[in-house]
């Protein structure tokens, strides 16, 4: 399964770039830190978010051999100007690459790239591979555009060419402004976002055009696998709406992508294993 990590310190990007609500850290007296989005509190994090040795000690009791580490999705900054997002991506990617170099038996790194600009994204993708990253983590949508949009295809094509895996993580959740109560964007929106990404890549023909592209959908694929029957039914009964870019049944793609095992429920995990097979989880 994946996990998130940040450097212990980082620049105040909002002050440096002069706009936006970039994330920066404000340390607390108890050793924790506040993630600040511009000038607003976003989340409190504790030492295991940046202390690599503490993380190793924490996962030892679970007999975990290695952690896949990547940034926290709010750091993506796809809304930012390309040059600034690229600088931020390089900073985060260098941090993870250095971590993996120090602990090669304990960590595997996934990079972040400025998806809002394909040329810059591919340049950083190539650089990330050269410094030891084995893949990238990207959002479930890019500034509310689906991953099936043709502008993103060259990035996926480069990932296939370079052998760089793609882990898709939900972010910028649909319905965020209309269901803030009860933390629903994370509880309801996140699984839906992951299914949105899976459906987009399948129905948009990206997985068909790039059969060697290695894609992993986080959080066990979100709501995609549990609702595959409904998705397939829609494909069969309304091909005029669903099968307009790819004529193949979405069920045929089972086993052609990966999901991680983060279900928080043993029965759900057993269902995912039944659907995907253990080698794709």
Protein language model annotation of sequence segments:
Residues 1-281:
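Helix-coil boundary/capping segments in enzymes
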């Amino acid at each position: 399964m994946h996990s998130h990590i940040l450097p212990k310190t980082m620049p105040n990007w909002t002050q440096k770039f002069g706009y936006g609500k970039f994330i920066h850290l404000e340390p607390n007296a108890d050793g924790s830190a506040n993630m600040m989005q511009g000038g607003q509190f976003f989340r409190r994090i504790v030492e295991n978010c940046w202390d690599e040795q503490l993380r190793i000690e924490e996962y030892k009791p679970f007999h975990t051999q290695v952690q896949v580490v990547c940034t926290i999705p709010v750091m993506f900054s796809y809304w930012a100007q390309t040059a600034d997002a690229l600088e931020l991506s390089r900073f985060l990617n260098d941090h993870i690459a250095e971590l993996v170099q120090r602990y090669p038996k304990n960590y595997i790194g996934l990079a972040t790239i400025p998806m809002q600009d394909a040329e810059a994204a591919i340049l950083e993708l190539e650089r990330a591979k050269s410094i030891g990253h084995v893949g990238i983590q990207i959002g479930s949508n890019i500034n509310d555009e689906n991953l099936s949009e043709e502008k993103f295809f060259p990035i996926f094509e480069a990932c296939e060419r370079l052998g760089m895996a793609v882990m898709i993580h939900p972010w910028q959740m649909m319905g965020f402004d209309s269901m803030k109560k009860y933390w629903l964007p994370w509880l309801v929106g996140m699984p839906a976002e992951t299914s949105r990404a899976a459906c987009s890549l399948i129905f948009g023909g990206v997985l068909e055009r790039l059969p060697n592209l290695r894609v992993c959908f986080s959080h066990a694929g979100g709501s995609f696998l549990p609702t595959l029957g409904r998705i397939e039914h829609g494909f069969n009964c309304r091909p005029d709406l669903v099968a307009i870019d790819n004529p193949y049944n979405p069920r045929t793609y089972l086993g052609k992508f990966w999901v991680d095992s983060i279900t928080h429920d043993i029965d759900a995990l057993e269902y995912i294993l039944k659907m995907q097979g253990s080698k794709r989880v």
